[in-house]
Amino acid sequence: MAERRRHKKRIQEVGEPSKEEKAVAKYLRFNCPTKSTNMMGHRVDYFIASKAVDCLLDSKWAKAKKGEEALFTTRESVVDYCNRLLKKQFFHRALKVMKMKYDKDIKKEKDKGKAESGKEEDKKSKKENIKDEKTKKEKEKKKDGEKEESKKEETPGTPKKKETKKKFKLEPHDDQVFLDGNEVYVWIYDPVHFKTFVMGLILVIAVIAATLFPLWPAEMRVGVYYLSVGAGCFVASILLLAVARCILFLIIWLITGGRHHFWFLPNLTADVGFIDSFRPLYTHEYKGPKADLKKDEKSETKKQQKSDSEEKSDSEKKEDEEGKVGPGNHGTEGSGGERHSDTDSDRREDDRSQHSSGNGNDFEMITKEELEQQTDGDCEEDEEEENDGETPKSSHEKS
């Protein structure tokens, strides 16, 4: 009872808020950026003090009117005015408390750390020999991972990695003062927005009009009937699309053994806007082993190399054909004489090598014998030529 009396006395001392204060608080409530979180089991909206000060400095009360001074000229004047709003319980100060892990989880982590430290000491000696192999494998994995990430980024509709945010909770602060900075303040004042008021009024009018459907004219009834049928067909088509895309995914998944994940209209049932639910048209993800990816890449590189080699071979063939047309038969005529000369020179070199294998005296004796044989051979050849010459002469005389 005593606390209630004190609270009533404080309210009487502070007084009720004026129209100007309500207008400023309403403007701040709907224009200052806010966030929602849980506090003491309730869902609340909170804002940051520095953003509230910036918002009020950009408002109409920061500009001087004719014959009147501006309400907000500096940041200090805004802070003083917000202190008045805080005392009149438009909002109150809160304290951010980061969520800590439970003691059981901490003990489990400590026990795991001790067990892992003992195992690591035993494995250190083995790891030193395997470090070189691991470094090579890691480099290859990094390259493959970069390629996969680049491919995923190029494909539209792929979900991006979510950044992990630290969780916190709000608690009421003991010192209820407005300070310009990163302080957190929770809204108590929650007026009805003009848009919500208009939407509620339209909804009430629509319900009353629906109850008066028998009194509508015939043209309006037919029009509403066709509109309702069209809306029902549209909803049914979306449901059929959702079922068909699941069936298509299952068929591709079964045929490829779970390696290819193909989704048609992936955002159709997602919590997005109407237009965003139909974009992108499809998404494709490959979740098979990396060996298949490497094989595909190797096959592509081989195909490229084959195509390059075929192009080179075609160009070389053309050059050879052009070279063959120019020289003609001149090369064939000179080739026969060169072959004969090469065989004679080879024979002479073989004879010289055989003769040089013996001593010096043997070489002299062999040369003399060869000279005698050569002279005898020359004489015999001369006699044969003379005999050949005489035979045609005798034939001519007989004729």
UniProtKB/Swiss-Prot annotation:
Residues 1-196, 256-399 are cytoplasmic. Residues 108-167, 289-399 are annotated as: Disordered. Residues 218-234 are lumenal. Keywords: Endoplasmic reticulum, Membrane, Phosphoprotein, Protein transport, Translocation, Transmembrane, Transmembrane helix, Transport. GO terms for biological process: cotranslational protein targeting to membrane; post-translational protein targeting to endoplasmic reticulum membrane; post-translational protein targeting to membrane, translocation. The modification Phosphothreonine is found at residues 158, 375. InterPro entries: Sec62. Its main location: endoplasmic reticulum. This is Translocation protein SEC62. The chain crosses the membrane at residues 197-217, 235-255. Mediates post-translational transport of precursor polypeptides across endoplasmic reticulum (ER). Proposed to act as a targeting receptor for small presecretory proteins containing short and apolar signal peptides. Targets and properly positions newly synthesized presecretory proteins into the SEC61 channel-forming translocon complex, triggering channel opening for polypeptide translocation to the ER lumen. The modification Phosphoserine is found at residues 335, 341, 353, 356. Coiled coil: none annotated. Residues 372-389 have a biased composition (Acidic residues). Pfam families: Sec62. Residues 108-155, 289-324, 336-354, 390-399 have a biased composition (Basic and acidic residues). Residues 325-335 have a biased composition (Gly residues).
